[in-house]
Every structure is written in C-alpha cells, then in structure tokens.
UniProtKB/Swiss-Prot annotation:
Transmembrane segments: none annotated. HAMAP family: Thr_tRNA_synth (MF_00184). This is Threonine--tRNA ligase. Homodimer.
Length: 642
C-alpha cells in the first residue's frame, strides 16, 4: 500500500490507493479546498487520480504556475460547454493553452460577431458560477470514439483515428452534459474558473493546413483571481497605447504597403532613429575590437547547398535566377563572413578574428505571421561572427556577454533572462568537444555572475548556445541576443588556419547577435518608450519657436547655433498661437521646446519646456546647448531636471 512522500520530506502511510485530493484532505480542509491537481513522481495528474504505489506527491494550487495553466485549459473546456449550449450544432476541434490564456477552434455555421462573443462569455460565467464538479473518466479508445461519433464531433473522431493509439485509454472530462477529451489534468470543480475574459476571434485552418477547412478560433485569457485578471487587462490596454504601429504612424516613422509585404518604407524620422542606432552599435564594435564588413545580399544556390541551409531552410528563402544560375537572397550573414575569412592564409596569430555586419537579410515569412516591425520579411541583422581556437572560446564568450549587458543597459533594460541550450541527441562532434564547449559557456556566465537555466537538448546540432531574453516595462519577453557556438559551418565551407604546430586546423565560429533585427528592436524601443525616445535617439531633439514675427531672426540664429553644435533641431515660425505649437510638438514627442519671446531675445536667453510639460524657465543659450550635448553624448535616459 502506498507511502506518500511530500515536498518537505514527511511521509504519510495508507492501506489503500489514494488520490492527491485524499492526501490534501488528510493534511487539512484548507489545502483540499485549494487543490487543483497533483504532481506524482514529477508528473502532473488529476486531483482524483489514484496513487497505488509508493510515490512523491506535490499538491498543485492556483499559486503554482502549473495550477494557472490547468485553470486556463479548463476554461477552454468551459468555452466548449457554453458554445454547445448556445449553438448545439457546433463541432469542437482543439482547445489548448497559450501564453496568458487559451483558445478553442470551432466549426460553426455562422461567423461569430462581437455580440456573439459577449453572449458566449456571459454563458461561460453563468456555468462557472454553478461551481459544478468536473468528472474525469478513463475509457477505451473504442468507447471514446463511439461517444464522439454519437455527438457528431467529427474533429474529435479524427484526432482519435490519427493521433491516439487503439490500446490507449483517453481521458473524457464531463462538464455536466458536455464531454471533452484531453490528456489533462483539469480542475476538479469550476469554482477555480471564475476569472476569465474572451478576447478576440480569428480564422484558423484545421491542423494548420490551408487545404483544410477554415475554422473559427476563439481566444480567451484566464487568471487565478480577479486582481490578476484586471492587471493583465490593464497591461493590454497600456500595450495598445504603446503599439509601435500606431505610434509609428502618429510620429511618421515608417509605413508598409501591400506591394511589399513585410518590407519597411522608412520615413526621414524613422530612418534617423535607425541610423542613430547604427552609430551606437558601431561605437560598441570599435570598443570591443570588431572589424565591420559588408557582404552581398544574394549568393548562388550552390553555396547554400554547401552550408546545409538549402536542405533545411529553402522554404524560407527568396530565390531568383540569371544566366541559368539560381541565386538565393540571404536569410543570414554567416556564410558570407566565412567567405571573407577564407580570403588569404590565416595563422593562429590572427585569431580571434571578430567580424560584424549590418546585414540586409530576407526571409519568406508567412503573410499571416507578419506584424509591423516585429515580424518582417526584410530586416537588418546586427550580428557578428568570431573565428577563434577552442582555447579562446571562454574569453570570447565572456566578452560577448559583457557587450550584451553593456548595450542593453543603455536602453534601461534590467530584467534579462538567460538560458543555456545544451547538446541535442542528433549532433556533430565528440562528447569531449561538447563537454568543453558547454562548460566554457557556463563558466563564462558564472564569471559574470549571471544566473541562468539550462535548456537540456535544445542546442543546435552544430553547437550549444546562450539566449538572452529581455523584459520590457510591461513585463513582455523579447528574445534578442544569442551567443551560438558552431563547430560545423567553418568545416563545411573549408575555413582553416595554421596552428602553432604548423598544421591546418578548423576554427570555431561564434555567432553573436545582440539587438537581433534592427527593425524589430526599433519596434521594441518604440513600445518601451511609448514614442518618448531618449533625446539621443529622438528624430528631432529640439524645436525652436517664436511667439510673434519679431523673434523670427533670433529663432533662425538659435536654430543654426544648435545645428552647428550637432543637435537635431527644427524652427517653427508658423503664424500660430504658441500654445498650439507647444501642443503639436508635445504630441510629436519632441524632447525639448525652446520658446523665444521679446524677453528672451533681449536677454539672449530661451524659455525651455520638456515634452512632459515641465517648464525649466528662462536659461542661457550656451548653458542649454552644453547640457543638451552632455545628455546626448552620454546617451542618457533622463531629460534635464528629471
């Protein structure tokens, strides 16, 4: 009979099989009331599943990450329950958990309107408030199939026929009269599923195949309590205000159009931000001793066949042909950098060789996945490749890590999650080589006092990697930086150097990206700063305004002086009220507005206002210029007097 070992090491002995709920009740009624599921010997199970042998058990509640995921999954079933009550002929497809919520794909003979979604959410609340028990039954494959055939659930029957073995025992979850099929676990009672909201609908092909029927996908979010739900909805509201597509249009930064899907038309102000970002990256390349190179954006298919990209990546590559030769527009820069490395004989004394490029890359992303600057087809990578010996890996990775944190801190990103991906089952190279490579990456992180987690088996076949994911002000994750070891590509492309022993050796290649796609990073910054770019990045840093025509000459002189000082400045001499001008440039997020009236002209000063509405008073022109230059030069995130 089972001996149950709890997380604190204590044990409970039973003379009969028990469920996680039984054990929770044994511990106390409070825990039993909070119990959502159990983790038995490391595996999630339903609260009602019986434990027959000795086992470790952790009780899962809404405070656990797994508990929240189970709540979300059960809310998908709740959605199914509600939609079948409102529209009984609906056929249910799949309803998985996604980030922050869930969705369900349904086959319905009507297009859901906003009113329909509201009615559906209302019915879900009515059902959840009944606090009914969710009953799980393990049945044979044949019984499960018969159940769904009788109910006309053709998609569930297809899942059974195509994805579930005949000797398996599927779990059927009964929500009163509604039955769904799932591996589980699910909540034992609907009292856990009160805090949700349906968000939107979209089209989705069955099994993601455009040859199949288009279904309707209903998205929802669910949380453990009302406070968490409201906080999430507030974050979404704030995110909508910060949407880089909306701000990009408002500030006239860029546009996209149907004739070039996923390609950016940069306007003057947006391109100014892009170039300033390039200047910043170049300054860091110089500081960390990189060469900057430029490779062709298109190379022959033969080269991509050698690298292995053609076999594994051709669907994402744009191709063209000329004079009976096929060419590929590059999706990445690395093969071109190896070609540059291969020019001329290299010695161990030439290593490490650090090569960087603002590479113009193109990938044939599905049109439905394109999203403003965040997901494009044409983009600029800020990546670099370091050619080094095995002995130099640790020092080079160390320098890459320092560079990553150095650059991210400039933009105020402080929360960075780091993951180390280790060897997959299918890989090249010896175990000894992988042992050393993984150890080098881990030690480099440890030497920089950076906490990290392992992603076992998630490395590429050609080497382990470090991933850097930064979190923005809304706590959204953006995976940008990568340090990837590569033991394959240099060999495939015949890269070599002469070692100390006078023998030819293959260099290790380190792929290093920090911002990733420049376009995407500008999108991230636009949302992070809500368009209030720090002064050094702002397209227009200062606007000088007159109150009446009598100050026009002074405004022009001051504008020229600011330009000569290297400040991006515009003069606004329009015959408009000063309040109108200030409001307009505030909406354009211009960091500083310098107002010139008769008093300022007479005193040789200028009245300074910030875009946040702060009046800094009347200041000496030279002092203002000096302070602005210092703010810009230091790439400060703070404005004057903040």
């Amino acid at each position: 009979m089972p001996v149950i070992t709890l997380p604190d090491g204590s044990q409970r002995h039973y003379d009969h099989p028990v469920s996680p709920m039984d054990v929770a009740l044994d511990i106390g009624p409070g825990l039993a009331k909070a119990t959502i599921a159990g983790r038995v010997n490391g595996e999630l199970v339903d609260a009602s599943d019986l434990i027959e042998n000795d086992a470790t058990l952790a009780i899962i509640t809404a405070k656990d990450e797994e508990g929240l995921e189970i709540i979300r999954h059960s809310c998908a079933h709740l959605l199914g329950h509600a939609i079948k009550q409102l529209w009984p002929h609906t056929k249910m497809a799949i309803g998985p958990v996604v980030d922050n919520g869930f969705y369900y794909d349904v086959d319905l003979d009507r297009t859901l309107t906003q009113e329909d979604v509201e009615a559906l959410e209302k019915r879900m609340h009515e059902l959840a408030e009944k606090n009914y028990d969710v009953i799980k039954k393990k049945v044979s494959w044949h019984d499960a199939r018969e159940t769904f055939v009788k109910r006309g659930e053709t998609y569930k029957v297809a899942i059974l026929d195509e994805n579930i073995a005949h000797d398996d025992k599927p779990g059927l979850y009964h929500h009163e009269e509604y039955v769904d099929m799932c591996r589980g676990p699910h909540v034992p009672n609907m009292r856990f599923c009160h805090h949700f909201k349906l968000m939107k609908t979209a089209g989705a092909y069955w099994r993601g195949d455009s040859n199949n029927k288009m279904l309707q996908r209903i998205y929802g979010t669910a949380w453990a309590d009302k406070k968490a739900l409201n906080a999430y909805l507030q974050r979404l509201e704030e995110a909508a205000k910060r949407d880089h597509r909306k701000i990009g249009k408002q500030l006239d930064l860029y546009h996209m159009q149907e004739e070039a899907p996923g390609m950016v038309f940069w306007h003057n102000d947006g391109w100014t931000i892009f170039r300033e970002l390039e200047v910043f990256v170049r300054s860091k390349l110089k500081e960390y001793q990189y060469q900057e190179v430029k490779g062709p954006f298109m190379m022959g298919r033969v080269l991509w066949e050698k690298t292995g990209h053609w076999d594994n990546y051709k669907d994402a590559m744009f191709t063209t042909s000329s004079e009976n030769r096929e060419y590929c527009i590059k999706p990445m820069n690395c093969p071109g950098h190896v070609q540059i490395f291969n020019q001329g004989l290299k010695s161990y004394r030439d290593l490490p060789l650090r090569m960087a490029e603002f590479g113009s890359c193109h990938r044939n992303e599905p049109s439905g996945a394109l999203h403003g600057l965040m997901r494009v087809r044409g983009f600029t990578q800020d990546d670099a490749h370091i050619f080094c010996t095995e002995e130099q890996i640790r020092d080079e990775v160390n320098a890459c890590i320092r560079m990553v944190y150095d650059m991210y801190s400039t933009f105020g990103f402080e929360k960075i999650v780091v993951k180390l991906s280790t060897r997959p089952d299918k890989r090249i190279g010896s175990d000894e080589m992988w042992d050393r490579a993984e150890a080098d990456l881990a030690v480099a992180l440890e030497e920089n006092n950076i906490p990290f987690e392992y992603q076992l088996g998630e490395g590429a076949f050609y080497g382990p990697k470090i991933e850097f994911t930064l979190y923005d002000c809304l706590d959204r994750a953006w995976q940008c930086g990568t340090v990837q070891l590569d033991f394959s590509l240099p060999s495939r492309l015949s890269a070599s150097y002469v070692g100390e022993d006078n023998e030819r050796k293959v260099p290790v290649m380190i792929h290093r990206a920090i911002l990733g796609s420049m376009e995407r990073f500008i999108g991230i910054l636009t949302e992070e700063f809500a368009g209030f770019f720090p002064t050094w990045l702002a397209p227009v840093q200062v606007v000088v305004m007159n109150i009446t025509d009598s100050q026009s000459e002074y405004v022009n002189e001051l504008t020229q002086k600011l330009q000569n000082a290297g400040i991006r400045v515009k003069a606004d001499l329009r015959n408009e009220k000063i309040g109108f001008k200030i409001r307009e440039h505030t909406l354009r997020r211009v960091p500083y507005m310098l107002v010139c009236g008769d008093k300022e002209v007479e005193a040789g000063k200028v009245a300074v206002r910030t875009r946040r509405g702060k009046d800094l008073g009347s200041l000496d022109v030279n002092d203002v210029i000096e302070k602005l230059q210092q703010e810009i030069r230091s790439r400060s995130l703070q404005q004057l007097e903040e």
